[in-house]
């Protein structure tokens, strides 16, 4: 019988291999001894984070990243089916998540969306290169409690501030929390623009969202 550490490694490696079959096989094995949230967080998401690092270093290319993301989604779907009915139906909150206009990076934000969803939040992922007004319009449409704004470049960081300003103009700021993230974002930046929180990675995003919304 494989140890938990070995199973976690196998899950992570299966994501990096970009092979859906390998991911599903690893998930089936891990399910026997691990909770779904742990499989996603410590295994699949860790692998996806590694894929992101390899992509940034030019060791993997976009098609690999897309295949790895598809494989992860397939693994998460299997686990969602196994989660207790209550976990699937009881929504902790409604979150709109996207990457700001001018920024085509998607990996980190997608991992955050997947992790938030698996933690029990209703997540509306509006993609990448999203115009400022779309964040606010979507939040209104789905009656969101929180907006997650990712920016991966210093040039697009300003978009996070603009979303907050627009929320204020629309009179929504008091009821919609704002979480910012992405490589150039910091806690100091979040404080400066008046965001409710900053999350360095997907696990932290889940913890902060629970802190703010529960």
From Swiss-Prot:
In what residue span(s) does the B12-binding N-terminal domain sit? 1-91
Q: Which GO terms describe its biological process?
A: homocysteine metabolic process; methanogenesis; tetrahydrofolate metabolic process
Q: In which pathway does it act?
A: One-carbon metabolism; methanogenesis from dimethylamine
Q: Among its keywords, does the record have Repeat?
A: yes
* Molecular-function annotations in GO: cobalamin binding; cobalt ion binding; methionine synthase activity
Binding-site list for methylcob(III)alamin: 105
What are the residue boundaries of the B12-binding domain, all occurrences included?
A: 92-214
Q: Which InterPro entries match?
A: Cbl-bd_cap, Cobalamin-bd, Cobalamin-bd_sf, Corrinoid_p, Dimeth_corrin_MtbC, Met_Synthase/Corrinoid, Meth_synthase_dom
Which keywords appear in this protein's UniProt record, sorted alphabetically? Cobalt, Metal-binding, Methanogenesis, Repeat
Query: May I have one GO cellular component term?
Result: cytosol
Annotated signal sequence is none
Entry similarity comment: Belongs to the methylamine corrinoid protein family.
**Matches recorded under PANTHER family:** METHIONINE SYNTHASE
Report the protein's function. Answer: Acts as a methyl group carrier between MtbB and MtbA.
Q: What is this protein called?
A: Dimethylamine corrinoid protein 2
This protein's encoding gene: mtbC2
């Amino acid at each position: 019988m494989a140890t938990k550490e070995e199973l976690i490694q196998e899950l992570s490696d299966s994501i990096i291999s970009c092979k859906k079959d390998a991911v599903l096989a690893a998930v089936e094995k891990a399910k026997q001894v691990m909770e779904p949230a742990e499989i996603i967080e410590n295994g699949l998401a860790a692998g996806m984070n590694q894929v992101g690092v390899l992509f940034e270093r030019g060791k993997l290319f976009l098609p690999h990243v897309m295949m790895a993301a598809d494989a992860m989604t397939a693994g998460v779907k299997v686990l969602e089916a196994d989660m207790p009915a209550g976990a699937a139906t009881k929504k902790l909150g409604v979150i709109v998540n996207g990457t700001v206009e001018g920024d085509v990076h998607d990996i980190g934000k997608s991992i955050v969306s997947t992790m938030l969803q698996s933690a029990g939040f209703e997540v509306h992922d509006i993609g990448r290169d999203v115009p400022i007004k779309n964040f606010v319009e979507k939040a209104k449409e789905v009656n969101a409690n929180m907006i997650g704004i990712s920016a991966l470049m210093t040039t697009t960081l300003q978009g996070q501030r603009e979303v907050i300003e627009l929320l204020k103009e629309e009179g929504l700021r008091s009821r919609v929390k704002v979480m910012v993230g992405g490589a150039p974002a910091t806690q100091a930046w979040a404080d400066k623009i008046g965001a409710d929180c900053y999350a360095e990675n997907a696990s932290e995003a889940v913890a902060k969202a629970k802190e703010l919304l529960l």
